[in-house]
């Protein structure tokens, strides 16, 4: 490709509304342009990267035995009503009616459509297992699209759905998809972790997220510094302290604390170690409970894990925190003065709290706290559960090493759905025993457009994008200095351009009448891995300058050797 016949569209300045580095660089490198909120046009450079990501995904899905299909973006509402998600999904589901007043949606996902297809096409266990996939546009009406294509309303996604007659069969396909995803992200040159995850609104049993490590990530991911243990922070287990609870050394004392309504204020005003404080959070109880509220206690420096808390048998789902009015109606004290002593509602404490002694907590009286509280002496030990977020340095739950926490960008997610959708849509086949059998499902997604942004978040420097070789828009940039004035520069550039293309190498030759500084800046901004610079001065010695984008290393290569050098560098 020649720049004179190409839409380069690079920008010198960073657009003001671009918050994260991937959004900034995708705009500056001429990869995307905004059409409306959360909607983007992919320009040639961006589309080349997107297609490379898509091709790697497709190759590995095919290698794993999945079958490609293509389903409509527009879906009839009756399928969503049949599955129960018409009411559940919320405003992210873009709904509309056609000219016949029939309701439809723009598909944010395709569980209903694929299950409808399978229930009409499959009849026997002999046809299973099957795993269908597509790479197709999705639409979610995000309340606040942001970060460019990282959280857009329209995006390209690979979604796959597998169907089985046994949990064992589902597990085999799930393991195959886990391995395929690992190969996909490894081939793309990404630093990622596969982490245990919550199944969320999609439902089901086992679930893993594939997270690309990046400072701009929206998720906290947890992994051991020694073993393969990794989990989303929502699921990472905080194991109980290994040391026994220390003996009491203080008497419980009622202390006036009129200006201490938060843990931070209590610690500052009374010079308490925060590790000796407990905070009490009140949430709604399940409907058939004798009490309307449940008290959850975590150490002062720890955070409640809402996903873990919501799964407790006494706690209502979705997790709902009590209002001050609701708290006062039950406790007769405000939220800044709550604690376990004389608490009239069920109490659940975190494992770390259960190991505490001589601690401070609210007295359930406005403006007062108890100091020196000890379990079993001052208050009976309540139900103990893991209800906090882990912190860096906690022991790994597998007993190997300690936990690290980093930010991650979710680029893939795999689920064992079980029978949630097949039961709702009555998708069954005749089993081996001749009886009807409801199908067991798995689903497996990759955000193809999000992968492009995540790769940039992990691969950039002050000059622009530093693409991993496998997904770079071009493999080689040829920069002929003053080629419109120097015949030998032009002749060699054209010769190398033809020879490299004949080797199957993707080349961008900058044949613009531009200053060298502009040419260098654009190629580095775009992030092409290999650059060769052809100039009269080096040609006097039969040399060409070669530069590797990732390391910045430069070297002089003889003109007769440069093609073989590049072929070896690119193809190995």
From Swiss-Prot:
GO molecular function, one term: proline-tRNA ligase activity
Protein name: Proline--tRNA ligase
Gene from which the chain derives: proS
Localization: Cytoplasm
Catalytic reaction equation(s): tRNA(Pro) + L-proline + ATP = L-prolyl-tRNA(Pro) + AMP + diphosphate
EC numbers for this chain: 6.1.1.15
Keyword flag ATP-binding: yes
UniProt cross-references to PANTHER family, sorted A to Z: MITOCHONDRIAL RIBOSOME PROTEIN L39/PROLYL-TRNA LIGASE FAMILY MEMBER, PROLINE--TRNA LIGASE
Family: Belongs to the class-II aminoacyl-tRNA synthetase family. ProS type 1 subfamily.
Entry note about domains: Consists of three domains: the N-terminal catalytic domain, the editing domain and the C-terminal anticodon-binding domain.
Lineage: Bacteria, Pseudomonadati, Pseudomonadota, Gammaproteobacteria, Enterobacterales
Keywords linked to the UniProt accession: Aminoacyl-tRNA synthetase, ATP-binding, Cytoplasm, Ligase, Nucleotide-binding, Protein biosynthesis
Pfam families tied to this protein: HGTP_anticodon, tRNA-synt_2b, tRNA_edit
HAMAP family on file: Pro_tRNA_synth_type1
Keyword Calcium: no
InterPro entries: aa-tRNA-synt_IIb (IPR002314), aa-tRNA-synth_II (IPR006195), aa-tRNA-synth_II/BPL/LPL (IPR045864), Anticodon-bd (IPR004154), Anticodon-bd_dom_sf (IPR036621), Pro-tRNA-ligase_IIa (IPR002316), Pro-tRNA-synth_IIa_bac-type (IPR004500), Pro-tRNA-Synthase_IIa_type1 (IPR023717)
Subunit structure: Homodimer.
């Amino acid at each position: 490709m020649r720049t004179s016949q190409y839409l380069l569209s690079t920008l010198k300045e960073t657009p003001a509304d671009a918050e994260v580095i991937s959004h900034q660089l995708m705009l500056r490198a001429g990869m995307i342009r905004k059409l409306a909120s959360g909607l983007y046009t992919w320009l040639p450079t961006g589309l080349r990267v997107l297609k490379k990501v898509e091709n790697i995904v497709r190759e590995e899905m095919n290698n794993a035995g999945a079958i490609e299909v293509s389903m409509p973006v527009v879906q009839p509402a009756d399928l969503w009503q049949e599955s129960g998600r018409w009411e559940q999904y919320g405003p992210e589901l873009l709904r509309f009616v056609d000219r016949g007043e029939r309701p439809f949606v723009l598909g944010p996902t395709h569980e209903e459509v694929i299950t409808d297809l399978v229930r009409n096409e499959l009849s026997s266990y002999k046809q299973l297992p099957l795993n269908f996939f597509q790479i197709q546009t999705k639409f979610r009406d995000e309340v606040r699209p942001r970060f460019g294509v990282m959280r857009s309303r329209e995006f390209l996604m690979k979604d796959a759905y597998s169907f089985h007659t046994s949990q064992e069969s589902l597990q085999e396909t799930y393991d195959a998809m886990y391995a395929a995803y690992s190969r996909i992200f490894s081939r793309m040159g990404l630093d990622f972790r596969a982490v245990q995850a919550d199944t969320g609104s999609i439902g089901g049993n086992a679930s893993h997220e594939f997270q690309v490590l990046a400072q701009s990530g929206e998720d906290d991911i947890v992994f051991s510094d020694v073993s393969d243990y990794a989990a989303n922070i929502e699921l990472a287990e905080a194991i109980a302290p290994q040391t026994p609870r220390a003996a009491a050394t203080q008497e419980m004392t009622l202390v006036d604390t009129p200006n201490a309504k938060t843990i931070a204020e209590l610690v500052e005003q009374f010079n308490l170690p925060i590790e000796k404080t407990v905070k009490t959070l009140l949430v709604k109880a399940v409907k058939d409970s004798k009490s309307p509220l449940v008290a959850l206690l975590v150490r002062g420096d720890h955070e409640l894990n809402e996903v873990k808390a919501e799964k407790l048998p006494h706690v209502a789902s979705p997790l709902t925190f009590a209002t001050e009015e609701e708290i006062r109606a039950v406790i007769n004290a405000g939220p800044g003065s709550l604690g376990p002593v004389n608490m009239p509602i069920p109490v659940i404490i975190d494992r770390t709290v259960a190991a505490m002694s001589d601690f401070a907590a609210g007295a359930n009286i406005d403006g007062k706290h108890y100091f020196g509280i000890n379990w079993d002496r001052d208050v009976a030990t309540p139900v103990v559960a893991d209800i906090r977020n882990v912190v860096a340095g906690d022991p790994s739950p597998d007993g190997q090493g300690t936990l690290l926490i980093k930010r991650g960008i979710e680029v893939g997610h795999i689920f064992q759905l079980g029978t949630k959708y097949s039961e709702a849509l009555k998708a069954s086949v005749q089993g081996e025993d001749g009886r009807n059998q409801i199908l067991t499902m798995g689903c497996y997604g990759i955000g193809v457009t999000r992968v492009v942004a995540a790769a940039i978040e992990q691969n950039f420097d002050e000059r622009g994008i530093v693409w991993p070789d496998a997904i770079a828009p071009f493999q080689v940039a040829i920069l002929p200095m003053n080629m419109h004035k120097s015949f030998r520069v032009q002749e060699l550039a054209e010769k190398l351009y033809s020879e490299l293309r004949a080797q199957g190498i993707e080349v961008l030759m900058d044949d613009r009448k531009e200053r060298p500084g502009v040419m260098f800046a654009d190629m580095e901004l775009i992030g092409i891995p290999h650059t060769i610079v052809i100039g009269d001065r080096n040609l006097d010695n039969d040399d060409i300058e070669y530069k590797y984008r990732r390391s910045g290393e430069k070297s002089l290569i003889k003109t007769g050797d440069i093609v073989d050098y590049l072929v070896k560098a690119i193809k190995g």
